[in-house]
């Protein structure tokens, strides 16, 4: 039987020692949204709940300030 092992998910913010997620760091926030503009869930990214909440708030704030788009395109 062939078995495959998934890579263990880890929280990038805990590993790097980041305390607060900044809404102005657009390059980092883009890693956590899909091409359609949706926030990627923590079960996919491996982010801890504390940082997932901060990430969600930062993305929503960046969207409100027009730093990130709400959707990919409007048709």
From Swiss-Prot:
GO cellular component terms given for this protein: cytosolic small ribosomal subunit
Q: Which GO terms describe its molecular function?
A: small ribosomal subunit rRNA binding; structural constituent of ribosome
Q: Which SUPFAM superfamilies match?
A: Ribosomal protein S18 (SSF46911)
Q: Does the keyword rRNA-binding apply?
A: yes
The domain of life is: Bacteria
Q: Which InterPro entries match?
A: Ribosomal_bS18, Ribosomal_bS18_CS, Ribosomal_bS18_sf
Name the GO terms of the biological process aspect: translation
Q: Which is one Pfam family of this protein? A: Ribosomal_S18
Query: Keyword set for this entry?
Result: Ribonucleoprotein, Ribosomal protein, RNA-binding, rRNA-binding
User: Is Ribosomal protein tagged as a keyword?
Assistant: yes
Protein purpose: Binds as a heterodimer with protein bS6 to the central domain of the 16S rRNA, where it helps stabilize the platform of the 30S subunit.
**Record's subunit section:** Part of the 30S ribosomal subunit. Forms a tight heterodimer with protein bS6.
Task: Write out the similarity annotation.
Answer: Belongs to the bacterial ribosomal protein bS18 family.
Listed name of the protein: Small ribosomal subunit protein bS18
- Species assigned in the record: Buchnera aphidicola subsp. Schizaphis graminum (strain Sg)
Q: Name the gene.
A: rpsR
């Amino acid at each position: 039987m062939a078995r495959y092992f998934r890579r263990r998910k880890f929280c990038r913010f805990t590993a790097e020692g980041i305390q607060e997620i900044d809404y102005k760091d657009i390059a980092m926030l883009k890693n956590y949204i899909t091409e359609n503009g949706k926030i990627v869930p923590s079960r996919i990214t491996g982010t801890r709940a504390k940082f997932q909440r901060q990430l969600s708030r930062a993305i929503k704030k960046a969207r409100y300030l027009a730093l990130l788009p709400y959707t990919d395109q409007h048709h």
